[in-house]
Amino acid sequence: MNLKIIKTDDGSDTLYNKKLDETYHSLHGSVTESKHVYINAGLSSVIDENSKGPISILEVGLGTGLNLLLTLKFAKKNDLKIQYHAIEPFPLDNSILKKLDFNNKLEGFDKKIYKKIHHPKNLEPVKLSEHISFTKSITRLEQISFEKEKYDLVFFDAFAPSKQPDIWSKENFKLIREAMKTSGVLVTYSSSGKLKKILEELKFNIEILQGPKGKKEMTRATK
């Protein structure tokens, strides 16, 4: 098997991809990292701008679904309506999914909802809760015809640029930018020089923020 479950420092699980020699999340804590990058620096930052309507989120790299689980929890707590579209060309096998453990770090973790996240039909909307409508595209980002100016927020959570550089291409970020609303926000754990250069060339407003534990910096970019 190409994937191995690893317990991270905050007690939550992540996956190690042997082929890429890369983990899905930080070994310092998968929940800790995802909450810092995608919820605190991402979702929290767009609430005021979208208080009167649903927030539209695009995630590049659904992976274990952890960012979506944290979004579900945040949406319930803050009574938000969210339309969530995730791209994942390589969905995880059920034999791995059923062994992943987030119970100890995610209060109210619902296995029925988790099953819906990982087994919806391609592009068929699924209502995960009264707060979130979810769509999953089982394909590569560059193969999607995006609606223009649709997304308020983008979670870019693909494998590292050093491992899968093609995903971090200027062409892909151009597609994403066109799909973002004016003042839309993109957040990612990466702060690589190549990423900064691409975002600058595409006229994003870039903020280099403090990273989660074990990582000095992360990136937030606004259209």
Residue ranges and their predicted role:
Residues 1-55, 72-102, 106:
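Rossmann-like AdoMet
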Residues 61-63, 88:
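Conserved S-adenosyl-L-methionine
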Residues 152-166:
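A short SAM/SAH-binding and catalytic strip from SAM-dependent methyltransferases
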Residues 65-69:
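Glycine-rich SAM-binding Motif I of class I
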Residues 166-183:
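A short glycine-rich, Lys/Arg-flanked "PGG" loop and its adjoining helix->strand segment in the class I
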Residues 202-223:
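Core SAM-dependent methyltransferase catalytic element
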Residues 96-147:
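S-adenosyl-L-methionine
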Residues 155, 182-190:
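Conserved beta-strand signature within the Rossmann-like core of class I S-adenosyl-L-methionine
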